[in-house]
């Protein structure tokens, strides 16, 4: 048990997200995150990050286990819930690498590469494509069980594994809760 709450499999092709992603960049929605403008060829063609990639294994690791504990007094500074505790990059990379080695032990030597916010990966789009959740009006991946309180990690592998069902339907519908509570009013109208 690696501690992941969900594991999904999908193909590496995310080219159908290219136009939408680039239009958000051109509109300036990425603010000062200039790295989102770079390496677009790799972003839209995941197999170029790990040649021979046939399957992307996506994992979800929840970081908010006690929702009641997340309530913070308004007279104190706030710390993002994901920043409390150990560095998730290290935790997830270790677990993903272990998972990759376990798969490798079962399926002859395979090539794999693990990612946790470490490369130009369209992880939300890959996760949406796999059926793990849907991208909400707040641009986060939303999941029925965890909301948006989770980390994503990926393993690119050369093994053609069976993939999960297609993307979930967007369940936001007419809901605007995330837009209403955003303290900076950062999101344009959908």
List the predicted regions and their residue ranges:
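Auxiliary alpha/beta "docking" domains used to position bulky ligands
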Residues: 1-171
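Iron-sulfur cluster-binding cysteine motifs and their immediate structural context
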Residues: 4-6, 177-190
